[in-house]
């Protein structure tokens, strides 16, 4: 059996241009601190499954009900992924075929809604997601969208607003689950509101699935009608999507919405990677990993706060930290900086200069447009996979604060780069790839 390293050697010989670019990306991942909250590093076993001969096989349909022959082993692999997903999340039904979280969400809409129906989701600027009704997404074009947000004082979900909007607009579907919300989600509170107005309730747990699977965040599967997620992020699997439900009859509708409703042939090499990742997540070591993800994020948050950087909602309960950079601007202005305005766009570029990968992000009631933003989103999953602990995340917090508070000092930026390089050296990534 060939290994990922063998495959790269073959690629180097047959297509050196692609090989060189892959090696450059590998080096970038090794030499930078990956802090994008939606990214992680899959295991070598997941990489091996994705790079297997399963990529050759078409398998439209479901296990035991295919439209192509030669699927006997494909069926076993996909059924294994289904069974492991059900066990991991306590679901009665799982569909492992969605190519992405966005595809999973679209399949739910196709199964439950008609064009023109009303949906409710969190405002993108408050931590929602494009697929929850943004006007640039199909969800915002096909459906009537009502957005809820967070309380201006606490920056936590405003359930009074959610209830009032639900009573006023009577949505067919309420969506909970977010892309930039650092707090525990009260699924039971959403269930009560959905039941009152006769709405379906969908949880999108793409960001927190790994934490849910290990009990470090409440599980929406017993509460919500349907749950969607990606399989990477905190779940640490391949890039892909997953749909879960406690209702087998609803599961049949969801299956049809995936195929033939919105997709053709499933990506069975990716599904094999999902099966491997779900198996890894069922191990005790993964629960330890999830606990460390939260501890590391909280260590980072405490350091940033100690340095005078304000965090949205005042901290974090999960894997992500959202910085309100207006607090940095205030310090820069007080210190007489030539350019005192620190935006998400500027902070993103500064992070790149010191080899930290992050992303600008809107914050609740943001005065800046999304292309500029007033926030910086940081996450702990990838570096936790790499082996960093709270002490290292405290060091990273100091590095980030030094960079943000002294953005015009080349000496400070160079010192930050050296500190980042030392952390990368101490915690190597994918050494088996050479």
UniProtKB/Swiss-Prot annotation:
Chain sites annotated for binding (6S)-5,6,7,8-tetrahydrofolate: 124, 128-130, 249
InterPro entries: PyrdxlP-dep_Trfase (IPR015424), PyrdxlP-dep_Trfase_major (IPR015421), PyrdxlP-dep_Trfase_small (IPR015422), Ser_HO-MeTrfase (IPR001085), Ser_HO-MeTrfase-like (IPR049943), Ser_HO-MeTrfase_PLP_BS (IPR019798), SHMT-like_dom (IPR039429)
Site (Plays an important role in substrate specificity): 232
Full protein name: Serine hydroxymethyltransferase
Gene source species: Synechococcus sp. (strain JA-3-3Ab)
GO cellular component: cytosol
One Gene Ontology term of the molecular function aspect: pyridoxal phosphate binding
Record's keyword annotation contains Secreted: no
Keywords, in A-Z order: Amino-acid biosynthesis, Cytoplasm, One-carbon metabolism, Pyridoxal phosphate, Transferase
């Amino acid at each position: 059996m060939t290994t990922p390293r063998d495959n790269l050697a073959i690629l180097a010989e047959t297509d050196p241009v692609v090989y060189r670019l892959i090696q450059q990306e590998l080096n970038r991942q090794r030499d930078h601190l990956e802090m994008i909250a939606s990214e992680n590093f899959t295991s070598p076993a997941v990489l091996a499954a994705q790079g297997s001969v399963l990529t050759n096989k078409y398998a439209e349909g479901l296990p035991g009900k295919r439209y192509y022959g030669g699927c006997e082993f494909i069926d076993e692999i996909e059924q294994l992924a289904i069974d492991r997903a059900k066990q991991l999340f306590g679901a009665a039904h799982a569909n492992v075929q969605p190519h992405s979280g966005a595809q999973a969400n679209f399949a739910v809409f196709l199964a439950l809604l008609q064009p023109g129906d009303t949906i409710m989701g969190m405002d993108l600027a408050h931590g929602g997601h494009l697929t929850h009704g943004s006007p640039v997404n199909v969800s915002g074009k096909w459906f009537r969208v009502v957005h809820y947000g967070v309380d201006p004082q606490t920056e936590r979900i405003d359930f009074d607003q959610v209830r009032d909007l639900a009573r006023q607009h009577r949505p067919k579907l309420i969506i909970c689950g977010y892309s930039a919300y650092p707090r525990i989600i009260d699924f039971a509170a959403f269930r009560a509101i959905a039941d009152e107005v006769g709405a379906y309730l969908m949880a999108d747990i793409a960001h927190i699935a790994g934490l849910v699977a290990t009990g470090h965040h409440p599980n929406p599967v017993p509460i919500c009608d349907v749950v969607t997620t990606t399989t990477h992020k905190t779940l640490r699997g391949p890039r892909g999507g997953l749909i879960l439900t406690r209702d087998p009859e609803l599961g049949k509708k969801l299956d049809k919405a995936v195929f033939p409703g919105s997709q053709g042939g499933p990506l069975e090499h990716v599904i094999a990677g999902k099966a491997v990742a779900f198996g890894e997540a069922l191990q005790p070591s993964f629960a330890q990993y999830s606990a460390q993800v939260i501890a590391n994020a909280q260590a980072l948050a405490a350091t940033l706060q100690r340095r005078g950087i304000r965090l949205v909602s005042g901290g974090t309960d999960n894997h992500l930290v959202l910085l309100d950079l207006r607090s940095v601007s205030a310090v820069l202005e007080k210190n007489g900086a030539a350019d005192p305005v620190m935006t998400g766009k500027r902070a993103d570029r500064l992070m790149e200069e010191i080899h930290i990968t992050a992303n600008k992000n809107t914050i609740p009631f943001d005065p800046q447009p999304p292309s500029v933003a007033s926030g910086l989103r940081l996450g702990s999953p990838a570096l936790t996979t790499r082996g960093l602990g709270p002490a290292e995340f405290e060091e990273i917090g100091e590095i980030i604060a030094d960079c943000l508070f002294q953005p015009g000092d080349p000496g400070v930026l160079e010192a930050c780069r050296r500190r980042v390089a030392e952390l990368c050296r101490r915690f190597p990534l994918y050494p088996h790839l050479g």
